[in-house]
From Swiss-Prot:
Summary of the function given for this chain in its UniProt record: Probable transcription factor involved in muscle spindle development.
Annotated Basic and acidic residues bias: 269-283
InterPro entries: EGR_N (IPR021849), Znf_C2H2_sf (IPR036236), Znf_C2H2_type (IPR013087)
Protein name: Early growth response protein 3
Amino acid sequence: MTGKLAEKLPVTMSSLLNQLPDNLYPEEIPSALNLFSGSSDSVVHYNQMATENVMDIGLTNEKPNPELSYSGSFQPAPGNKTVTYLGKFAFDSPSNWCQDNIISLMSAGILGVPPASGALSTQTSTASMVQPPQGDVEAMYPALPPYSNCGDLYSEPVSFHDPQGNPGLAYSPQDYQSAKPALDSNLFPMIPDYNLYHHPNDMGSIPEHKPFQGMDPIRVNPPPITPLETIKAFKDKQIHPGFGSLPQPPLTLKPIRPRKYPNRPSKTPLHERPHACPAEGCDRRFSRSDELTRHLRIHTGHKPFQCRICMRSFSRSDHLTTHIRTHTGEKPFACEFCGRKFARSDERKRHAKIHLKQKEKKAEKGGAPSASSAPPVSLAPVVTTCA
């Protein structure tokens, strides 16, 4: 969209500035506005610049002639009168908001005097053409819901803490109620927020507000597992209410299969193994009582050690330890020859026998060619003499 100048005004901006009175900017600064009253240096007052105005210099850096001949219709106005300039712009393409393709310039009031009534009518007509109907705006954007006033939100006295340790200033509710008519609740929608400034020493007593977090059943830590002995004892008490008062039944020892080598002598002498197995038909003896206790679990079938992963029970703690390695994948025993790892030491020992057999075979193969490659020894003929 291009604009064409319909009427050229023979007036420059310098003429507008030259109409300002000299007493508009006083040379003396009032004492109330003096910012350097406390300083020792005297304040230097600046006089008005007597040089040419900036607006007087054109684009070609040529100073215009201050005395221009104006027509009769453009005479300089007196000091306190309104200067009104009118003009028109014409546009090529028509638009909806300007049917006549002509825009009238509004009148400019220089010294605060209200402009003419004709200029006001021009501005009003132009604004009414640009602004949409009020009904359409209300239909598109509904009105905000009313909120309560500020005084209703803060009914209790409010105190503000000073970080330097000064006592807080308390404000009574009457101060807020007196200022209530001056505020409009529709203009300032208020949301209550009680998180005021607090001293750093008082931050520990303020509860921390966290947003609601959904319960994820996967991330919730499971409760600790109840020992198996406690569960069994609780079940037995439910079945037999007087379980605690009844005497314990005698320990029954189940017979086990005989040893593979019953007559094999033990390395430990007999007098050093005082703890004998009380089971019938078992001739095992032990040098320590804990060894006897562990052995008796074979007869009783007691397995106090349970795996928490697969709930499998064991009679010995070392058996449970090696079993857990099957779940974790831990293999602490490595072979000295090939570096292969095992979860149990007996497995590594059994694997090491394979390397020992291979080593013996290599030694046998290496010794056989040396014996065959040796030159045959010629045997001297035995001469027998007859007497």
